[in-house]
Amino acid sequence: MTDADLDDMCRLRGDAEVMRYYPRAKSRNEVQRWINWSKDNYAKHGFGLWVIEHRTTGDFIGDCGLTWQNVDGQEVLEVGYHVLPERQGQGLATEGASACLRHGFETLDATMVTAIINPDNMASRRVAERIGMTVWKR
């Protein structure tokens, strides 16, 4: 993810439907900070968030990746994913999340990868379950 992705990321992170389980959709400045945070993650850890693009057309679809998150005072590796509303339901979040999970275990030698999911976000939970994740805490 780079600064060149700002317009596409604004379309994604500024979308009320995509951000339904967050406090609110993000402003352009907030999205730029999100991109900066992702770039910082790459500089510090060697990984972060990726843009999801269509293999053939290069059209923007969403984002996915691995980031360190603090959960109850413990640093955990999280897989996250967001897909534009018009591309949801096509297995793209599952494909991206699955690739991230493999990268976490096979390349980064992670012992655990988590997904922080709002309990009401059943679509995201189904993605996590499809890639073999299980609920361990509510």
Model segments located where?
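A short helix-loop-beta-strand connector motif used in the catalytic cores of GNAT acetyltransferases and
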Residues: S38-V51
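Acyl-donor (CoA/ACP) binding surface of acyl/acetyltransferases
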Residues: M1-Y21, L49-R138
